[in-house]
């Protein structure tokens, strides 16, 4: 049989498994690929393959992540699974593997544990909009009431962190039983095995509950300025990569950040020395701007659809601080520490006003390897939005990675 080529006919969604260590995230990932492989919609991956996740670098941080892909009748999924807890924290904060939704795995035998709580909090902070729950290890719970109790506990926890705990789909099953059954018979059809059917039921919920993400090209236009030069007789050109949306010749745009916001008209879009009618998300372009002097615009500003983004100086961020081994600091830092915040294309000096723990208590000292919530005050206003990623740098080296969880001012 000839190999079918990859058809981009189905909508694509990025998801991942989250939850406490040893609750069965990787086993579930294996079970999903094996169950869907039995229907010809995935390549079966066993636990060992997924667990030996390769190292990746994102924003100067090493993260172990396994990527698998599979399809359901209606969608194509890219699924990430991390072997270690620290990898999850780094992955979610750096956005190395963007998630449109997550499958929260909770062991029915143990109920929610500290990392269950931490991953739900992180999902909320970094903007993973929707979760579906898999209550794993159902085969180890004989008492139906106990299962209901765990479900209730999970729903309360989700509600506590601002998710729709009452309506989030929860499916109980056993990833291990499904994997064992599929090892014995890789071609199990729907309806032949209660455990693999539960995996299919979970995927039905994921299909139905996790909405399709808005495509980058459909979002409002934004390009971070990387370089600026003047072309005599034509005006000023700002270059950069279009982060989202599209821009056409003749459109009005705003220049945001560092100085007062100004507006101008795009009189030309160029790519590789060729003129275009429009630039699209992902393109590296030069924009010719009417009536803008070279000194009016600099790296670190953004050019965006009018009214779509505003400059700010104060925000709350969820930050992972690099360890010494990762090339971070060797010593802790304290309040009023003044590093550089690298946002999109530029470093801006800022001062850290305070630190807060997950429990909402003030923290005096932050150690390398910590994850912490911090309030940052920048010396210059720049275009910032919720969910935006940034790096914290000191003398040109990255010492932390963060995501904006709330804009204050």
Swiss-Prot record:
Mg(2+) binds at residue 26. Residues 10-214 form the tr-type G domain. It comes from Rippkaea orientalis (strain PCC 8801 / RF-1). Residues 60-64 are annotated as: G2. Its main location: cytoplasm. Pfam families: GTP_EFTU, GTP_EFTU_D2, GTP_EFTU_D3. Signal peptide: none annotated. The lineage of its organism: Bacteria, Bacillati, Cyanobacteriota, Cyanophyceae, Oscillatoriophycideae. It catalyses: GTP + H2O = GDP + phosphate + H(+). GTP hydrolase that promotes the GTP-dependent binding of aminoacyl-tRNA to the A-site of ribosomes during protein biosynthesis. This is Elongation factor Tu. Its EC number is 3.6.5.3. One of its GO terms (cellular component) is cytosol. It is found in: Cytoplasm. One of its GO terms (molecular function) is GTP binding. Residues 81-84 are annotated as: G3.
């Amino acid at each position: 049989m000839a190999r079918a080529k990859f058809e981009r006919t189905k909508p694509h969604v990025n998801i991942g498994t989250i939850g406490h260590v040893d609750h069965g995230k990787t086993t579930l990932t294996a079970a999903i690929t094996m169950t869907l492989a039995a229907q010809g919609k995935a390549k079966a991956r066993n636990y060992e393959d997924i667990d030996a996740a390769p190292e990746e670098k994102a924003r100067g941080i090493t993260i172990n992540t396994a990527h698998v892909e599979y399809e359901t009748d209606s969608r194509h999924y890219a699924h990430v699974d991390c072997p270690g807890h620290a990898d999850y924290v780094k992955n979610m904060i750096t956005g190395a593997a963007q998630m449109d939704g997550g499958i929260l795995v909770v062991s029915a035998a143990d109920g929610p544990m500290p990392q269950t709580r931490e991953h739900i909090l992180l999902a909320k902070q970094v903007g993973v909009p929707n979760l579906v729950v898999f209550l794993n290890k159902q085969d180890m719970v004989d008492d139906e009431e106990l299962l209901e109790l765990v479900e209730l506990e999970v729903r309360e926890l989700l509600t506590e962190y601002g998710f729709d705990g009452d309506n989030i789909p929860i499916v109980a099953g056993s990833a291990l039983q499904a994997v064992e059954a599929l090892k014995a018979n890789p071609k199990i059809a729907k309806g032949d095995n209660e455990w693999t059917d539960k995996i299919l039921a979970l995927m039905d919920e994921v299909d139905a509950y996790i909405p399709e993400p808005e495509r980058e090209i459909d979002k409002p236009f934004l390009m971070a300025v990387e370089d600026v030069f003047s072309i005599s007789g034509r005006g000023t050109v700002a270059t950069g990569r279009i982060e989202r949306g599209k821009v056409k010749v003749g459109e009005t745009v705003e220049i945001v950040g560092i100085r007062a916001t100004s507006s101008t008209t795009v009189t030309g879009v160029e790519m590789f020395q060729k003129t275009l009618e429009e630039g699209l998300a992902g393109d590296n372009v030069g924009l010719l701007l009417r009536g803008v002097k070279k000194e009016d615009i600099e790296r670190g500003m953004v050019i965006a659809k009018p009214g779509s983004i505003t400059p700010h100086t104060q925000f709350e961020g969820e930050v992972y601080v690099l360890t010494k081994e990762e090339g971070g600091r060797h010593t802790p830092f304290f309040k009023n520490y003044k590093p550089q915040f690298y946002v999109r294309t530029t470093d801006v000096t800022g001062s850290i006003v305070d630190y807060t723990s997950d429990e909402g208590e003030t923290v005096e000292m932050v150690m390398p390897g910590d994850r912490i919530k911090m309030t940052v005050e920048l010396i210059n206003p720049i275009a910032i939005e919720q969910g935006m990623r940034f790096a914290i740098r000191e003398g040109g080296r990255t010492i932390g990675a963060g995501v904006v969880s709330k804009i204050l001012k």
